Amino acid sequence: MAIVVKPAVERGKIAPFKMGHVALKVRNLQEMIKWYGTVLEAEISYANDDVAFMAYDDEHHRIALVKLPELELPAENATGMDHCSFSYKDLG
């Protein structure tokens, strides 16, 4: 049985109406810029040697990439974000 969640605003609560952005720590900034540019059609709204802000809509940025090349890969059983998803109106 699926549970239908009534939006918080409809329940009289103050809640975001959409997610603003996500910031990701990356080891290879240029590789990630290329990946998000290709997969999400995101464009750079600001970048320097250590950070890039990218957007695919009218927001300043939806994805912030912060270069930290010294980071180690997390252990397989470490806590952290597993995934995020993006909705498309049409793939055609």
Show which residues each predicted segment covers.
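Conserved active-site tyrosine of GNAT-family acetyltransferases
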Residues: M32-G37
